[in-house]
């Protein structure tokens, strides 16, 4: 597997979850990753592609020249030599953005070796000239060819240059010609976009993200007592990286309208974000302790996901598995995992206030387990080899 991170964040955990199951069935698996640390129990799977310095250099070049995915040639060539020796039966791609790998070098190897490829697209980056999500600005340039990108300064940000037109056509050429490739999307919404992109005609399969229901379940704890929230209605938000597009400032707006009976709790913030938020919001930094996270989910009265663009957020699944109802904006694939009555228009703070006051919100029923996700992937592996 190839992904920007290993064992952390939603995509990194998906990789290690699959690796665990493969190992249990007697298979061998490696996760090649680009950045950040790996939890110790998963180091046996991990192979790092780029050093921290190489990631920084790639990031600087991407910001200066708007060429994300086209740097790190030396590191990628070195990685391909390792892959040649390892000689995998199948390659499973995940996020190829993140300032760690060169797509031209990678796909030259893939086409030359004609290995079966599964590519799980967690966002839209693969078929745009720049951005990973465009729903918030209703951009449709990706349908015919990106240019004059309105999200040039959005991730992966470019400070000066707009190379979205070149990037679009470069990706279209690089990703074409892979004979045995299946694209997997976590949501029907993203599958419909891929079908309209230059990947049209490629086999596409929807496999919903799954979560570890042995961990994410109603969990007792002392979270209320620890933070003095015994008599409060807790409104929770969780993200691996908070930003405006994740709805961070919508929580600020909401906090200004709530009375003292409520407390907003946000998990996953940076230290600087914590310092900037108003006192009405309890700000908690990132945690890799998923058992602790399950306790927080279970304690909350309502989970709010005001995302402006998301594929199939696992936080929705985790919260509901812990017994907490979820409300989300009508955007992307986020709506596919919650009851329809819990969905409101994007940016509708008044609508959010109405749902917050509702004491009878439901939870979506279904099998969102890790087991169903992993089994579907392994069946796909067997079909592809």
Name every feature range the model reports, one short phrase each.
Residues 268-291:
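Nucleotide-activated donor-binding/catalytic signature segment of Leloir-type glycosyltransferases, i.e.
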Residues 325-328:
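Short hydrophobic beta-strand element within catalytic cores of glycosyltransferases
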Residues 192-195, 211-226, 275-276, 385:
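Acidic anion/phosphate-binding donor-loop and adjacent secondary structure
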């Amino acid at each position: 597997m190839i992904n920007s991170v290993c064992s952390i964040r939603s995509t990194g955990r998906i990789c290690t979850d699959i690796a665990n199951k493969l190992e249990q069935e007697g298979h061998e698996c490696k996760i090649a990753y680009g950045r950040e640390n790996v939890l110790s129990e998963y180091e046996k799977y991990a192979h790092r592609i780029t050093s921290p310095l190489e990631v920084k250099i790639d990031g600087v070049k991407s910001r200066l020249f708007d060429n994300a995915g086209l740097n790190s040639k030396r590191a990628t060539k070195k990685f391909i030599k390792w892959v040649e020796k390892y000689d995998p039966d199948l390659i499973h791609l995940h996020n190829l953005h993140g300032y760690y790998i060169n797509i031209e070098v990678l796909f030259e190897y893939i086409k030359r070796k004609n290995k079966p490829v599964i590519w799980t697209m967690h966002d839209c980056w693969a078929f745009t000239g720049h951005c990973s999500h465009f729903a918030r600005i209703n951009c449709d340039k990706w349908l015919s060819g990106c240019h004059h990108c309105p999200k040039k300064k959005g991730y992966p940000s470019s400070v000066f240059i707009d190379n979205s037109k070149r990037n679009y056509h470069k990706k279209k050429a690089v990703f074409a010609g892979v004979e045995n490739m299946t694209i997997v999307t976590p949501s029907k919404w993203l599958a419909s976009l891929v079908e309209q992109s230059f990947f049209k005609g490629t086999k596409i399969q929807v496999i919903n993200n799954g979560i570890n229901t042995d961990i994410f379940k109603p969990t007792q704890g002392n979270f209320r007592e620890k933070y003095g929230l015994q008599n409060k209605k807790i409104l929770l938000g969780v993200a691996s990286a908070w930003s405006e597009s994740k709805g961070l400032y919508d929580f600020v707006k909401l906090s200004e309208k709530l009375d003292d009976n409520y407390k907003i709790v946000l998990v996953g913030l940076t230290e600087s974000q914590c310092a900037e938020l108003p006192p009405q919001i309890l700000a908690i930094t990132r945690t890799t302790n998923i058992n602790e996270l399950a306790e927080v989910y279970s304690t909350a009265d309502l989970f709010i996901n005001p995302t402006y663009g998301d594929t199939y957020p696992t936080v929705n699944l985790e919260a509901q598995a812990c017994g907490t109802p979820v409300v989300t904006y009508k955007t992307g694939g986020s709506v596919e995992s919650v009851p329809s009555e819990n969905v409101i228009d994007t940016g509708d703070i008044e609508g959010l206030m109405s749902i917050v006051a509702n004491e009878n919100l439901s939870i979506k029923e279904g099998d969102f387990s890790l087991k169903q996700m992993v089994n579907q992937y392994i069946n796909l592996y067997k079909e592809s080899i």
